[in-house]
Amino acid sequence: MFNSSSLNVYFICGTQDVPEGKDIREILKQALEAGITLFQFREKGPTSLDGVEKEHLAIDLLKLCHDYQVPFIVNDDVDLAEKINADGIHVGQDDENVKSFAERFKDKIIGLSIGNEKEYYHSDLEHVDYIGVGPMFATISKNDANAPVGPSMIATLKNINPSLPMVAIGGITEDNIEPIAQNGADGVSVISAIARSHNIDKTVTKMKSYFK
């Protein structure tokens, strides 16, 4: 059964997010040692890997996560997630309906991106373990990100469905988490804040401190 505490510090990363000269495996290892609670492999963009290279990297990262008993989630790529037996899948509003994923992913974690109340009410949540709500703030990590909805969107959706685990996403740094936690989020999902941190251990520790 999915535990909402897995969302406390949710790291999302692909090779396109890693600073030049750094290796994603080493960054993930540092993040795991620092105490991240969930990892999502999101390999997207003009410089990203595909095919066999992407699959081999995914397997390396999956093994790393399992060494630390941290769930490994794949973004969007259902075929890859199935092939490597990932712990779950995260899908967006533009993807095929969630029910079809659930049928292929029995006993796996399924996450869904939701940006506002309208998307919430139009989403099939029966098979969803958690939702990613955002963007909270303006973000540089996603070129196609929508306008920020702010931390209050978490409170709005929690009022509608208090038992549904929710993780905040978009433009989050270690310095703007407090209002997110105050509005009832179960955790934060970040890309650049960890991938480009000068001290990953310190960054993750500070993030975790808001969700004790």
UniProtKB/Swiss-Prot annotation:
Quote the cofactor binding remark. Binds 1 Mg(2+) ion per subunit.
Enzyme type, top EC level: transferase
Biological pathway: Cofactor biosynthesis; thiamine diphosphate biosynthesis; thiamine phosphate from 4-amino-2-methyl-5-diphosphomethylpyrimidine and 4-methyl-5-(2-phosphoethyl)-thiazole: step 1/1
Give the EC number(s) listed in the UniProt record. Answer: 2.5.1.3
* Keywords on record: Magnesium, Metal-binding, Thiamine biosynthesis, Transferase
Residues noted as binding 4-amino-2-methyl-5-(diphosphooxymethyl)pyrimidine in the record, renumbered to the chain? Q40, F41, R42, E43, K44, N75, S113, K142
**Catalyzed reactions:** 2-[(2R,5Z)-2-carboxy-4-methylthiazol-5(2H)-ylidene]ethyl phosphate + 4-amino-2-methyl-5-(diphosphooxymethyl)pyrimidine + 2 H(+) = thiamine phosphate + CO2 + diphosphate; 2-(2-carboxy-4-methylthiazol-5-yl)ethyl phosphate + 4-amino-2-methyl-5-(diphosphooxymethyl)pyrimidine + 2 H(+) = thiamine phosphate + CO2 + diphosphate; 4-methyl-5-(2-phosphooxyethyl)-thiazole + 4-amino-2-methyl-5-(diphosphooxymethyl)pyrimidine + H(+) = thiamine phosphate + diphosphate
A single GO CC term, please? Answer: cytoplasm
Superkingdom is Bacteria
A Pfam family: TMP-TENI
> Which cofactor does the UniProt annotation name?
Mg(2+)
* Positions bound to Mg(2+): D76, D95
| Disulfide cross-links | none
One BP annotation, GO: thiamine diphosphate biosynthetic process
Single GO MF annotation = magnesium ion binding
Amino acids binding 2-[(2R,5Z)-2-carboxy-4-methylthiazol-5(2H)-ylidene]ethyl phosphate: T139, I140, S141, G171, I191, S192
Its biological function? Condenses 4-methyl-5-(beta-hydroxyethyl)thiazole monophosphate (THZ-P) and 2-methyl-4-amino-5-hydroxymethyl pyrimidine pyrophosphate (HMP-PP) to form thiamine monophosphate (TMP).
Family per similarity comment: Belongs to the thiamine-phosphate synthase family.
The protein's matches in HAMAP family, at most eight in alphabetical order, are given as: TMP_synthase (MF_00097)
Q: Which PANTHER family match?
A: THIAMINE-PHOSPHATE PYROPHOSPHORYLASE, THIAMINE-PHOSPHATE SYNTHASE
Q: What is this protein called?
A: Thiamine-phosphate synthase
Q: Tell me which species this is from.
A: Staphylococcus haemolyticus (strain JCSC1435)
The gene for this chain is thiE
